[in-house]
Amino acid sequence: NADAIIFHTDICLSPKTNILDGRRKIACANFSSPPRNKLLRNEESMNFTHLHVHTEYSLLDGSSKIGEITKRAKELGMDSLAITDHGVMYGVIDFYKAAKEAGIKPILGCEVYVAPGSRFEKTPGESEDRYYHLVLLAENNTGYQNLMKIVSRGFTEGFYYKPRVDYEVLTEYHEGIIALSACLAGEVQRYLARGMYEMGMEAAKRYENIFGKGNFFLELQDHGISTQQYVNQQLVRMSEELNIELVATNDIHYTYAEDADAHDILLCIQTGKLVTDENRMRYEGGQYYCKSPEEMAELFSYAPQAIENTYKIAQRCNVEIEFGVTKVPKYEVPEGYDSWSYLNHLCYEGLAKRYPDMNADGEIDSTQGIYNIKERLEYELSVIQTMGYVDYFLIVWDYINYSRVNGIPVGPGRGSAAGS
């Protein structure tokens, strides 16, 4: 094999000796995925799960179609697969359904952006240090709820070029979440790549303190980039010194190795560059595809525990989403009431104000004769209760009432509770 020099983003990388096993490795080695029609029998497959996966919902960055990659994982003998799109979770439901249909367990996650300081700070720093990457996986339904809160806070409070969160948010919503240190853009890896080992250790200990012992893992990746070879060596050392376990991942951005060129064009669209531009963002080496368990085991033969840990993590992650069921938030009612009695109280109170001439039997004398308004109210309330919308009507009453009290105009609604 001839020596080669490649470009990864704006850094020139040359072939380097693999520090971990002493073998010479070319940084730009050509890899190809197994044939598309290859099916691994269960007895041939090994326990491995991809935990770092970007789909088409990582806009202009991931090109893996959800239906395609879930089927591919199944073909390669895996029984579970994660989704970890950049900063968003709007692909989770489609992924969950597709994974179930493919016969594999969906692991719901997100690769979030972590601000180096407060999420509220909106001042530009060094381009590399505006945010760090961190992979979060929901271990259970509590973790799934917390993960949604983390991502939402990134948009509502921390958005600055990217939806960022900070250590405060991670600490507040850490329960039920497993964290991985991510790629070279992760905080730990970024320090290590700069030769700042002690700073990397402090970052790792901080994340472990946030998520708890056994819930934070140091992430090994190898895409043929020489910097990763050095960082991986430091991560192995750090794992031994801090007793933080390793996990092996492939930073999947497309499903098959032959999709690399199409993905490169997608990056050009994202960055406004031409394919022929030399100094532009690119994912060199063609290794960001859904690799087989055998490929991953060979790539990380020096750290078999990191491979095993992918499956152990997958076994821990169990989120169940129920579809076809109306889920209404519970309205907090005053002491002495439940939702049903409080809605009745408000309705009868309003009835007395609107119809002061109503008699004790609930009858009013209209132009069309005697009309029992109380019977009508009781019927409407029974329908609301039967449909399970008691709390919903209280919620709508609450914000409409707040608007009226605070001088916010409220208009008639068409076909909605607000206009009732």
Region spans (language model):
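Short hydrophobic alpha-helical segments enriched in small aliphatic residues
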Residues: 2-4, 9, 19-22, 29
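Accessible peptide chain termini
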Residues: 1-2, 310
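Phosphodiester-processing cores and adjacent nucleic acid-binding clamps
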Residues: 23, 27-31, 36-420
